[in-house]
C-alpha cells in the first residue's frame, strides 16, 4: 500500500491497485485488512509512526536545540512524505478518522512533541504553564506554516527561511522572563 501511495498519490490508493502491487487478488486485501478502510488505517498508522520517529528522534543535549530540531524535522517529514502528510492531515483519501488504533498512533506522534516541551520546561529553558497546551500551540503554528507551504501559499521568496523564522519566533515566545 505504501508503494502505491508514494507512486500514485492518494487518489491511486485502491484495493485493486494495492492487490496488483502485492501480486494478490483484491480479496486478499479484504481478508488481511478488512477492505479500503483497513487499508487506509494501515497507511495512517504508518504515517503517524514515521512522524513520531521524526519528531522524537532528537539527541541534542541542549533542549532548546532539540525543540528547534524537532520543528525542522516536522517540516522535513512533510516535504519528504507529501502523500502521507496529505492522507494524515488533508483528508486526501475520504475516510472516517475514527479508528481507535489510528488515534493511538496519532496521539503518540503528538506525545513526542509534548515530551520535548516538557523536558525543556523542566530544565527551565522555556516557560510554560502546561507543557501539553504549549505543545498544542507549537504544533498548530508549525502545522499551519507547513500546510501553507505544501499548498504553495507561502508569499515570501524563501519558504525554508520563513519557516525557520517562525520556529525562532515560537522559541523566543517561550523564553523565560528575564
Regions found by a protein language model. Give the residues of each.
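Amphipathic alpha-helical linker/stalk segments
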Residues: 45-69, 98-104, 122
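C-terminal alpha-helix
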Residues: 116, 169-177
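Helix-turn-helix
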Residues: 4-38, 42
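Small-residue (primarily alanine) positions within well-ordered alpha-helices
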Residues: 1, 19-22, 71, 135
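Short hydrophobic clusters on alpha-helical segments that form packing/core surfaces
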Residues: 1-5, 13, 47, 51, ...
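Hydrophobic alpha-helical connector segments
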Residues: 56-84, 134-138
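Hydrophobic/aromatic-rich alpha-helical bundle segments in the mid-to-C-terminal region
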Residues: 86, 96-103, 107, 121-168, ...
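Generic hydrophobic, amphipathic alpha-helix propensity
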Residues: 1-2, 18, 43-51, 55, ...
Amino acid at each position: 500500500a505504501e508503494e502505491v501511495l508514494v507512486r500514485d498519490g492518494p487518489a491511486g490508493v485502491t484495493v485493486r491497485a494495492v492487490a496488483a502491487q502485492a501480486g494478490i487478488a483484491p480479496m486478499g486485501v479484504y481478508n488481511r485488512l478488512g477492505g479500503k478502510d483497513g487499508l487506509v488505517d494501515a497507511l495512517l498508522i504508518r504515517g503517524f509512526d514515521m512522524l513520531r520517529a521524526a519528531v522524537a528522534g532528537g539527541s541534542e543535549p541542549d533542549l532548546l536545540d532539540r525543540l528547534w530540531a524537532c520543528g525542522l524535522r516536522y517540516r522535513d517529514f512533510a516535504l519528504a512524505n507529501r502523500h502521507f502528510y496529505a492522507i494524515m492531515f488533508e483528508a486526501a483519501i475520504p475516510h472516517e478518522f475514527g479508528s481507535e488504533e489510528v488515534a493511538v498512533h496519532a496521539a503518540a506522534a503528538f506525545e513526542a512533541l509534548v515530551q520535548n516541551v516538557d523536558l525543556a520546561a523542566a530544565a527551565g529553558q522555556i516557560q510554560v504553564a502546561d507543557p501539553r497546551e504549549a505543545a498544542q500551540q507549537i504544533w498548530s503554528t508549525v502545522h499551519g506554516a507547513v500546510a501553507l507551504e505544501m499548498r504553495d501559499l507561502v508569499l515570501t521568496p524563501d519558504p525554508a527561511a520563513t519557516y525557520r523564522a517562525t520556529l525562532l519566533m515560537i522559541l523566543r515566545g517561550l523564553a523565560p522572563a528575564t
